[in-house]
Amino acid sequence: MTEADYADFLVVGGGTCGCVVAARLSEDPSATVMLLESGSGYRSALELPDVLGDPYRLPVGPASEYTWTYPVELTPRRASTIARGRTLGGSGAVNGAYFMRATRADFENWPSAWRYDDVLPYFKKSETDRDFESEFHGTAGPIPVERRAWDQLHPLSGEFHAAALGAGFPDDVDKNAPDSFGVGRVPLNVADHRRISTAIGYLMPALHRPNLRVESGVNVIRIVFSGTRAVGVDVLDDGNVRRIHADHVIVCSGAVATPHILLNSGVGPAEQLAEQGVSVILDRHGVGQNFVDHPEVLLPYHFSTPRAIRSQTPVLETALNLAELEIRPYTASFTDLVPGVPRMDHGVGVVLMAPRSRGSIELASGDPAGAPRIRYNYVASTHDRAANREGMQIAENLLESIAETGLIDRPVVEYTDEWVESRLGTSLHMSGSCVMGAESDPFAVVDDRCRVIGAQGLSIVDTSILPTIPTRGPHATAVMVAERASAILLGDE
């Protein structure tokens, strides 16, 4: 067996988590680490295309070379398309640089080994916070975190903050504090007007290590097993299938691709696998189930007078966070941010951050190269529909207050099911499709050490394992999970 087709640790997916895991594992010079990425790869930050470092543009449009796109069913009556990162750094390399952590309360329903006090050291290890120095913030981590200066805020962001305070909502000075609640500035993984993904912050500084190898442009089609032990993967490389062997396979392909890879490998609900002609290795009912995201309804607003697009303005500078809701005053239309999308209004996002509805990711065919069947089952629960309307009312009231300043016209909002569903979208915060839980839980896929239950030599490290979706965007939490999982894999925990 040659060096080219073997590694001690084989990391599948060079997205947000995969870049962290590969960089941290390769800190052990005695371990060989190989990272496989389906999209584009770069040897240094100097090679990075400008659009991947520009936090004011979102290269996720229909013609983007940096994303995978998937057809999805948001509701039985509303189809859509989602985009996932297809480059080193993954979706964190193409998003709006929102870097809020999960709150202390979010971890109360996680396994006991993953409570807030257990994970705080890894949040801190991941970051250099440029605005706060306290026991809750890191000062020497790979990801810089900063908030937009008050005097540089877009007018809408400033008026939104003032309107929310005027409505009686608390001033949320530090949104990465453990019990964050209220209105305040959004933490961003940005430094010097540059989006710092985990590819830039973690992976590229490690590429000089002789024990770390990165292959880009290769698609993993299945995990290879000997019995129930993972011994490698099959990849599609320039149209040819190639096998790479490993002592330990770590799947970091995200909440869509990870369950899809497992299902194609024979790990998942036995009945579903049999229907598609896939041989069953492990009957794990939870693979692809419990899929959850943050549903979002966009309420339109219009500036009272035409305004020039501000070229260096983050898409989201302030936000209102409540127990189960997030209200997002976007500073620009997504038409101006995302190349190739249809004309859209400026909007304020009303987002359910603790939805009860759950969806699924299943095999649509036995072809590993085919797209999975993705059903969101959005707003199926009565609770979600009521919470959504509560959020819409709050957002409408805030827009009315902003309109009184003359900045925007008065909003026009309808509350019919048809109007709401026509504006329903997703935050692209996919989670939960291979959840972490107790071995006795038939729907758990990994244990509290990120090991696939019933398998050997196989771990999952990405947002698919989150037991519950955070009430904040998952990016910062994903980095924390990858930091802690790396420590577990290295035997430091």
Curated annotation (Swiss-Prot):
Top enzyme category: oxidoreductase
Binding site for FAD: 8-37
Cofactor requirement: FAD
SUPFAM superfamilies linked: FAD-linked reductases, C-terminal domain (SSF54373), FAD/NAD(P)-binding domain (SSF51905)
Keyword line: FAD, Flavoprotein, Oxidoreductase
Active-site residue numbers: H429 (proton acceptor)
Cross-referenced InterPro entries: FAD/NAD-bd_sf, GMC_oxidoreductase_bact, GMC_OxRdtase, GMC_OxRdtase_N, GMC_OxRtase_C
Enzyme Commission numbers on file: 1.1.-.-
Family, per entry: Belongs to the GMC oxidoreductase family.
Entry protein name: Uncharacterized GMC-type oxidoreductase in thcA 5'region
